[in-house]
Amino acid sequence: MQKVVLLGSTGSVGKSSLEVIEQNKEKYEIACLVALSNDELIKTQAKRHKKAKIYIEKPRNKLSSKKLINKNDLLKLISSNNVDTVIAAISGSDGLELIHHSITSGKKVLIANKEPLVMAGEFLVNEAKKYGAQIIPIDSEHCSVHQSIQGKKENSISKITLTCSGG
């Protein structure tokens, strides 16, 4: 059973990821749901994932729940043996710190947006090699590139051109 931390569980990619996980309950279990501010939706999600912890960066309302954890606890959880995979479905650069922490903790990290790879791709890839982590892109464009270069030697590719982007 893969234990998953879902960064950005209340966004569109996060909600889609939850649907896939819920359809594959025998393979995956949510260890923690992470959101920026949508505390109402994350509470609903947590009811469906009874064992999941909750972390909200900027809650809109005061929440009280035994499941609620602080950022330090989130970092400890990601570092622990209780997590196998981190899905980074946070837009922009906001998830970069948690992505880096997940990589340095040796996790499998599924990245759903291009920004972290554009900003720090070489650094993150080198860190993944150093710490034995996996970076797997799940956004359409960079997932296609990832799939296209699997099994190829690094020096055999000099250029990649994307002919369209954004749908």
Task: Give the ranges of each region predicted by the language model.
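Redox-cofactor binding/interface segments in oxidoreductases and associated redox assembly factors
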Residues: 87-89, 111, 162
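Beta-loop-alpha module in the N-terminal Rossmann-like domain of NAD(P)-dependent dehydrogenases
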Residues: 69-102
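Active-site-proximal loop->helix
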Residues: 16-25, 45, 119-133, 148-151
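Short internal beta-strands
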Residues: 31-36, 52-58, 113
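Conserved anion/nucleotide-ligand pocket segment
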Residues: 142-167
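Residue-level signal for inorganic ion chemistry
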Residues: 10, 46, 86, 106, ...
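N-terminal Rossmann-like dinucleotide-binding module
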Residues: 1-49
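Rossmann-fold NAD(P)-binding glycine/threonine-rich loop
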Residues: 93-105, 114-134
